[in-house]
């Protein structure tokens, strides 16, 4: 059956037929592919994880479509070496095999860091959501992103209340471009210092007391959190651009509180 199939006339390539609307497409490709990758780990050299991957290229106005299967073929080609130091090469391959001028690669993945409880010194793994966003046109561009959970305690509530203050878990999202390599662990540590207290996956009673009291002595609005992150990121000479967001999932309000700052070294 296979031999008979191969004898048939070659199949037409519909994607390469001309499109008469003359409208170019900025991004077209495949989205949400689950695939294993390797991430550099500060303490253990590397870490294996699973990423959700998006791959896009541009499409000239005269082509009807792109070749979707080639994106997955490229992933399989680099299946043993999908890592940060290979992203530019993968993007270059995408441009070559898909006849594109621009290529984009996005990855979101869980990254685990061993954390030590502040008093008991109990160790546990903490999960963080990280992103790699890379593109290649005339030059290579890369953005590292991390979502860092922290605790925030409201300064206004502390000032007004006779008994404690409302506090909640918050998510700080930071994205950076850099001129020299930055460890994920170092960026996490910097951002965790911007809330009222870090978050831990394992706390004993003595740790809970310490963390609760630390947050109470260090109240922060979302405004404080993004400003503090800005001060710390601007002090890092290898950071050329960054954006930082803070979202408090308010414990006594129906809404969330939000703040964001974006800066580049040039500005």
From Swiss-Prot:
One of its GO terms (molecular function) is GTP cyclohydrolase I activity. Gene3D superfamilies: Urate Oxidase. It catalyses: GTP + H2O = 7,8-dihydroneopterin 3'-triphosphate + formate + H(+). Signal peptide: none annotated. It comes from the Bacteria. Coiled coil: none annotated. Pathway: Cofactor biosynthesis; 7,8-dihydroneopterin triphosphate biosynthesis; 7,8-dihydroneopterin triphosphate from GTP: step 1/1. Its EC number is 3.5.4.16. HAMAP family: GTP_cyclohydrol_B (MF_01527_B). Belongs to the GTP cyclohydrolase IV family. Converts GTP to 7,8-dihydroneopterin triphosphate. This is GTP cyclohydrolase FolE2.
